[in-house]
Amino acid sequence: MLKPLGDRVVIEVLEAEEKTASGIVLPDSAKEKPQSGKIVAVGSGRVLDNGTKEPLEVAEGDTVIFAKYSGTEVTYEGTDYLILRESDILAITK
């Protein structure tokens, strides 16, 4: 499994809708880039200016909304993930 460093998290991206509310099937070129996903791994935390380590506010299993073009897309063992900094996460959905 991937283990992110520092203040980074690994997210399994939730796919965008295939159809509109009225039932129209969207081609790949018309789909919005997904902005939500489930956290599958978190780093050890961010290092503060005084040298202490602060744990992250998010945890494995949280579903989050993140900035549209943030992070780095990676494929690991056949699954696509997004690795991004905690500061790119906008909200946790419950």
Swiss-Prot record:
Q: State one molecular function term (GO).
A: metal ion binding
Q: Name one Pfam family in it.
A: Cpn10
One GO term under biological process is: chaperone cofactor-dependent protein refolding
Sorted UniProt keywords: Chaperone, Cytoplasm
Which cellular component terms (GO) are annotated to the entry? cytoplasm
Q: Where in the cell is it found?
A: Cytoplasm
> InterPro entries in the record, alphabetically?
Chaperonin_GroES, Chaperonin_GroES_sf, Chaprnonin_Cpn10_CS, GroES-like_sf
Tell me its family: Belongs to the GroES chaperonin family.
Q: Which PANTHER family match?
A: 10 KDA HEAT SHOCK PROTEIN, CO-CHAPERONIN GROES
Its quaternary organisation is:
Heptamer of 7 subunits arranged in a ring. Interacts with the chaperonin GroEL.
Function recorded in the entry: Together with the chaperonin GroEL, plays an essential role in assisting protein folding. The GroEL-GroES system forms a nano-cage that allows encapsulation of the non-native substrate proteins and provides a physical environment optimized to promote and accelerate protein folding. GroES binds to the apical surface of the GroEL ring, thereby capping the opening of the GroEL channel.
Protein name, UniProt field? Co-chaperonin GroES
